[in-house]
């Protein structure tokens, strides 16, 4: 059983989108909200369905609730994050700060990822491959990211995950999150050509 627990601890950073760190890439958001990222997202995996609900907290911060499919017979793993955009050079990454204690991720730990909108209903998330120690400063992390962007080694090969949006979330002018509703213009499923 301990082997499975240790394996889960090793795999968790990859599932969440990167290694965990004590410090954020940037201490405050570099950009306003990207409303294309708001909504309920799903990822079909061998162990089941993982879901992420991304809602606005303010004009530049997100609330992310992540519920990962069970791995190896275990139960679902739920996480709550505060997230914001962190610009490094010309690239934008997301800093996610864990808001509650969990067995696999300490409260206050930071995880980084790159999000790429493929179309209105698909976002591709890629973990970052960083060798910096857990206590690296934001400046040290950004320096390593710039270096890895230049040499093409920032992203873990074949680790990108395509999440599908299944519902939208609306943000009212008063700053409250509106109700989740089915997509107004859902993308038709891709048809395979014979």
Which residues does each PLM region occupy?
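C-terminal motif of bacterial Sec signal peptides marking the signal peptidase cleavage site
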Residues: 16-18
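Calycin-type beta-barrel ligand-binding domains and close structural analogs
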Residues: 20-36, 44-194
